[in-house]
């Protein structure tokens, strides 16, 4: 976590301050350290989401925010000065867009673990703007089921109206739940399935601080597998018409994707450690059963905090 660096960057955005509403959502805090830090930034609002889980926090942000466009990032991210301007420009250029994602580059590559994360795929999705949309009658799952290609939750923005129309984030997904991820992937899919456009805008750039040690990297890679397959299960359960596409994607991911990476780990064991591939593979199988458990957990959390708005 480097919240101070994140907020310093947001304070330096090349965008009119009176048009910005910056909110820090403190998720299930155990102390007042975040509140104390945020108090140093007069233009930043602080709020608490007592229910543990990243998607609960995102939903709190949706309720608290005042703008027509809501941009999300994380506390281990430093936004480029032109981040918000590029997001706003992409929405203006694409009136049918309900989501804009952006380029995520490493803030540093100082350790072997950070270099390995980039070699494994990282968060970067290229340097060309792309617009994705599903035509009427097309299967969103068949065409764009692998939504990780569009970006990541560390750099995504939505029109507020989309949440009013299609609902907020699923609190059974992502960090702080048994699924450990998938909330961003599921929302990208929801955007495309609704018929709206999703824009990848590389000019909307942020820098992410990757895990510095190998054990943390291995855990992250395993959680990627858990989160991705939890997203597939959730999508298959929610949209029966997409079930076959999700099954096909899951089978392809388990066999072709992982077998190819295992082969690379044999050819280049130092550059591409096999235990990272196996960690993601184990996580993928684990993810097949995690979503149901996470739904029960989210329901329990909702009952314990039933006075909180959903």
Where in the sequence are the language-model features?
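Non-catalytic, C-terminal membrane-associated alpha-helical segments of glycosyltransferases
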Residues: 220-226, 240-310
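Glycine-rich, basic loop-to-helix element that forms the pyrophosphate-binding segment
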Residues: 33-35, 49-65
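Short, flexible, basic/aromatic active-site loop/helix in glycosyltransferases
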Residues: 121-148
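A short, conserved alpha-helix in the catalytic core of glycosyltransferases
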Residues: 149-167, 172-204
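Short aromatic/hydrophobic "clamp" motif used to bind/position activated sugar donors
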Residues: 70
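Acidic donor-binding segment of Leloir-type glycosyltransferases
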Residues: 7-48
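The conserved acidic donor/metal-binding loop of glycosyltransferases
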Residues: 74-78
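Conserved donor NDP-sugar-binding/catalytic core segment of glycosyltransferases
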Residues: 82-123
